[in-house]
């Protein structure tokens, strides 16, 4: 089984065809277009592979296509033709102003489904959407922002908070991204730019706004403090804190960032109970052995693996449990983990770094956070980042202990992050599970790590 969301490097070699699914406000009809003697959904194409969550790109194009003011709710169908390098997607839209124009062309979905040029995968998705409309039942794991009416409520809250903060009038609210785990808007006001973020309530996800409010007090130079919070709904409003360092930034800048984060982790190791009380997820190493067997037996996860890979995981299970005990026996303490630490989630500020996007904030072994060092393919860059990061730890702990912990964590990080993705995949609706069903990728990294340890 293959995940359709695997990373494709040559995005420009692809074509993306996007269909607009705009329901009639009161009748079982959808907006349609005529062309070449047939009826179809309004559609457009891009000469690249477009991420389905890129609402910043998609919304203006879809508004022009439909001649309507719309919100993008979610996609209802997705099809990839890898041989032809074409991606097809149907996005469900919500009409913002409810206005109907005399020249609008509305048709029953059955008429649309007569379009044989539309891939069969899209037909299946449209049929499922129609069944959902007829039943009136919404999948319980659907993201809130994929539901009608959510955008209006969020925008009212944003405008209320901007007024409360005395930031002047709201000039625009622009969608940036919307996918299965979060939704982000850019808010332009008379006095500057703000950002709104809504996050899902999922296993191992924190209430990000509440956690940031606490971390921002502990580390005011390193963590942004929300300007406004709605914890019950997972909403927060943040200042625009500038452009991220970026994955293509200079290696020495990234190395300094890793070293700075190591020092934050070392300090956090003295504040574990307070961090847990603030809402960070408790993922201390002791829990890992109990997660191994359920993970390796989870069909949603292992269905992407070959039979020999599944067998290798089962054979490795006792060894992995022993490695966990080895890591526990070393003196490196548990600490604060970001969960997705890379230069794209960091802002450079003079002599300090600001870390954002903390939905995965947790307490566990600090080295598990260094996935982008462990997975770095450039050996020279990898060594630079590794040595700079570890140098901070070696100021406090014996070099032999630090190096052994790094060696073991270089295998077990795959287990930690596979469990993270397993929980996410089970927490979102089946339609969008492929977006984040990447536990199998980290299981392969886990097997690579086991093999490397055996060869050393």
What spans do the regions from the language model cover?
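Active-site acidic catalytic loop and adjacent metal/ATP-binding pocket
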Residues: 32, 174-190, 195-196, 321-370
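ATP-binding pocket architecture of kinase catalytic cores
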Residues: 39-43, 79-115, 174-282
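Active-site catalytic-loop/activation-segment of kinase and kinase-like phosphoryl-transfer enzymes
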Residues: 130-154, 278-326
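Acidic, metal-coordinating catalytic segment for phosphate/diphosphate chemistry
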Residues: 2-17, 132-137, 141
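Active-site activation/catalytic loop segments of kinase-like enzymes and analogous catalytic loops
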Residues: 366-397, 411-431, 438-449
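A cross-family kinase active-site recognition segment
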Residues: 248-312, 334, 362, 433-437
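Conserved Nudix-box catalytic region and its N-terminal flanking loop in Nudix hydrolases
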Residues: 14-16, 21-71, 77-83
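Juxta-kinase regulatory segment immediately upstream of eukaryotic protein kinase catalytic domains
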Residues: 117-173
